[in-house]
């Protein structure tokens, strides 16, 4: 397995989360009750899995390695801007969810920002897949791919965290509103 393949595998798990985000948003728009603790868990997964783990791997290792060849820099810049957009949408979900938990009716904004996040994820994952393809074919050596993969896998605490986060996705997928 290469670093590119590893990130692609994470994308598969992220798309499981995207399906949950979509179903949650649709259920909220349809007036169905979803426990706020479940929406909290989705919000936590966005913050931890996407931002703290996946985006950090890309921003800390993968993108700098590709950029060191002074190639695909515009694509990297666009993806970094999109990562920031992701953080901003997630912040809106979080802020509206906090207000909802305090008793304000924030169902619609939470549903809207979840829907926005879902649309973002689908588009962003496709762009990253195309980027990985180019980087893999045109730039990165097998040695660089292997070195980054070892870096991704080296911190066992992160591997344990990912396992825990995937269990959270499993749990949410089993909820009535997610089926």
Regions found by a protein language model. Name each.
Residues 1-179:
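Small-residue-biased structural context
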């Amino acid at each position: 397995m290469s670093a590119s393949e590893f990130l692609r595998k994470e994308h598969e798990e992220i798309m499981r989360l995207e399906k949950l985000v979509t179903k949650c948003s649709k259920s909220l728009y349809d007036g169905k009750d979803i426990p706020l603790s479940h929406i909290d868990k989705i919000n936590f997964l966005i913050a931890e899995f996407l931002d703290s783990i996946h985006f950090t791997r890309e921003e800390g290792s993968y993108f700098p390695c590709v950029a060191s060849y002074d190639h695909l820099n515009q694509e990297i810049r666009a993806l970094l801007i999109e990562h920031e957009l992701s953080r901003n949408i997630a912040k809106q979900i979080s802020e509206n969810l906090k207000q909802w938990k305090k008793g304000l009716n924030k169902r619609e904004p939470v549903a809207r920002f979840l829907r926005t996040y879902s649309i973002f994820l689908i588009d962003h994952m496709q762009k990253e897949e195309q980027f990985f393809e180019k980087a893999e074919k045109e730039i990165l050596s097998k040695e660089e791919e292997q070195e980054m993969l070892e870096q991704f896998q080296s911190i066992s605490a992160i591997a344990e965290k990912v396992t825990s986060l995937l269990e959270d996705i499993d749990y949410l997928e089993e909820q009535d509103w997610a089926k």
